[in-house]
Amino acid sequence: MERYESLFTQLKERKEGAFIPFVTLGDPGIEQSLKIIDTLIEAGADALELGIPFSDPLADGPTIQNATLRAFAAGVTPAQCFEVLALIRQKHPTIPIGLLMYANLVFNKGIDEFYAECEKVGVDSVLVADVPVEESAPFRQAALRHNVAPIFICPPNADDDLLRQIASYGRGYTYLLSRAGVTGAENRAALPLNHLVAKLKEYNAAPPLQGFGISAPDQVKAAIDAGAAGAISGSAIVKIIEQHINEPEKMLAALKAFVQPMKAATRS
């Protein structure tokens, strides 16, 4: 959890926002997945948001569902994902690592065991996409017991009660949804969410990061101009992996070329 705090403090001092890429662990295979993650960090990623392949990804658009299918095709298991997480943490001791996942994967292991494992491999945060705030107690309590930040999604239509709950229960950062619906770069992010950002600040919520449909530097800049602490981009990155699936070196070069201007857009 502390890694997020020190990241946001450092970024504030440098007058920068955070750029955070999302990828599915093990896509398109364990070895290339590790190279992808190294490349994202070298290109300027401030933190990582990682998915664990799951058979029924409700909130994901087709791009990220395909990433999951590729990881499954490569035989990637949740146990292997935790081995990969330990390797990433070893190699990159200071970068915040977040997991974005579904409740079934947590239940399969047992809630407490799952968060204990996260703590052991050095995961900083977990967002359980299909657990609403009002049902989150067992997850967030286990997370805090194991020094893992529970992350909550703040939808564009959040009312005051929900904003207060998110501010009270969330740690690390707040996942600010650009709009309702499934993920995807083709559904460009809507207008900046100034009013939500202002409310979250008022209630002392963890710093908001805007996600969903972030695929261009101008959107990163707009998110930060609206008061967000940074932006998360998933589908646009996973699409690059898909486009260069048979050319691993080209894939890494294209990822670097995408991330560098996205990170540059966080500098005011």
Swiss-Prot record:
Signal peptide: none annotated. It catalyses: (1S,2R)-1-C-(indol-3-yl)glycerol 3-phosphate + L-serine = D-glyceraldehyde 3-phosphate + L-tryptophan + H2O. It holds the Pfam family Trp_syntA. Disulfide bonds: none annotated. InterPro entries: Aldolase_TIM, RibuloseP-bd_barrel, Trp_synthase_alpha_AS, Trp_synthase_suA. It is an enzyme of class 4 (lyase). The active site is at E49 (proton acceptor), D60 (proton acceptor). Its EC number is 4.2.1.20. GO terms for molecular function: tryptophan synthase activity. Keywords: Amino-acid biosynthesis, Aromatic amino acid biosynthesis, Lyase, Tryptophan biosynthesis. This is Tryptophan synthase alpha chain. It comes from Escherichia coli O81 (strain ED1a). The gene is trpA.
